[in-house]
Amino acid sequence: KGQVEYRDVTFRYSKNSEAVVEHVSFKAEAGQTIAFIGSTGSGKSTLVNLIPRFYDVSAGEILVDGVNVQDYGLEDLRNKVGYIPQKAVLFSGDVKGNLDFGHSQETPLSEQAMWQALELAQSKNFIEDKEAGLESEVAQGGTNFSGGQRQRLAIARALARKPEILIFDDSFSALDYKTDRVLRQELAEKTKSMTKLIVAQRISTIMDADLILVLDQGKVVGQGTHKELLANNEVYQEIAYSQLSKEELEHGK
């Protein structure tokens, strides 16, 4: 469960506008990590936003577990997907309420599940340090937490629901490199069955992905592992060498 397949997907915001995403095809098997990289405006975020149907494809189709996303009820589809946006959204209330958001009222999350999600998202320490713990207050927009903390709480919220598919829409950019690395190692070990789709700007975030798609102006201009792309894809090489040294780049898959 958690297989995602794009079949010749094209998306434009309106009938006559230019395609933001054009003729994209790939398949993610359950449990795989697929990453998307490319310059700003290359269509990475739009591409993953088509899975939970924030937008609908203009042509082609997207299948989740072999079923077209348009044939699911929206709630059923979104229950399969944990989506973490680039800008974490927190609501006024307490930590508990923020983690439980999106869970059905009949089966609220247990505190144990919340702590597990917080630990996995590298948030346990700063919540434990607060006197009220899970009952700690969250200001509107989460302004009483740092940017990196807000991001980790949004990741914990998505993890707590145990979705089949996790979509990180550039969600690692607010984290420092060390937290980013530790979090990805933990995710790799403890969410093996979840399919992970990662939109990123930093090569270091995606070097271990099973498949990386390089996007340029809405088109896939390369796909493969880090090693393959580093050897034969100019767009990827350009991004990679502008960020990391040759030695650092040799550690990926």
Where are these regions (language model features)?
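ABC-type nucleotide-binding domain
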Residues: 1-253
